[in-house]
Amino acid sequence: MKPVSRGMVLKILSAVMIVMAGAAGYALHSMRWLPWQKPVFDKAIPANCVAATDKAILIFSKTNGYRHASIEAGVKAIKEAGQKRGWEVVATENGAYFHEICLKSYRAVAFLSPTGDFLTDEQQRAFEQYIENGGGYAGIHSAADCEYEWDWYGTMLGTRFRSHTFLPYPIPKAEIVTEPGLHPAIDGLPARWSKKDEWYNFHESVRGKSGFQILLTIDESTYPAFWPKAMRGDHPIAWSRSMGKGRMFYTAIGHNASTYSDPTAMRHIMGGIAWAAALN
């Protein structure tokens, strides 16, 4: 048997180190919150938090963990699209907006890729009352990957983020399937359409859960679902439900800034926000 050369040993060791570094990087990235990151909570109620009109939407994008570079593009696009619809659109990263005085002046709150824990117990209760009394919620992308200790929030969503596409294809192009049915978030969308994104896997599908309407699914056969394995079949990525007198809409798309210049994606997002706000 021919002895292994020193060069070959070094190549093998390098490959092993790369794999280990990748696994460690994935583990840290999947945490979306790191032990040395301390949540910052806002407690002083802003003096100007009340909306000026009765067609107001609040965009909330506070990050106490990983921050998506697409947030600024998302805020800009939603503001512009909302204003064309005659809405007042206010954007904030101040958790103190989650107070009865502020919240009741908005038709819906859009959680635009927030991460970590960002609301106090009192602010969480204020939001729960807001939704149950008729307010709207629209969650975008990592809105399913935050506030893990808030049980009510997880119940509202119906499931939680588990993992997402990673190396060697972190942002693959995949085909999205528009589910049959009527809903402003899918009105006018193609039956199938392609998009690049960071595709989320969830702990479970919300299909079949009482009150949930699936809006979009992803065809797992159209993108490389290596490790971590995707959801092995039925893979919803957008859905809605009524909760109390309120409405919730969630879509997993939105990791990339390009989402917010994509007419099909924006039609979906704005339709979902409009439905949540009862402005459709």
Predicted regions and their residues:
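N-terminal Sec-pathway targeting helices
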Residues: 2-20, 29
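Helical hinge/lid and interdomain linker segments adjacent to catalytic or ligand-binding clefts
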Residues: 11, 59, 69-147
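A glycine-rich, often tryptophan-bearing local segment used as a flexible ligand/cofactor-contacting loop or short
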Residues: 117-189
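Extracellular/periplasmic catalytic domains that process cell-envelope and extracellular macromolecules
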Residues: 50-54, 83, 101-105, 120, ...
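Catalytic beta-strand/loop cores that center a nucleophilic Ser/Cys/Thr
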Residues: 42, 167-244
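Extracellular ligand-binding/catalytic regions of CAZymes and related secreted enzymes
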Residues: 11, 26-52, 80-84, 221-224, ...
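Solvent-exposed loop/turn segments at secondary-structure junctions
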Residues: 63-66, 95-98, 114-118, 137, ...
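Aromatic-Pro/Gly-enriched surface loop or interdomain linker
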Residues: 17-105
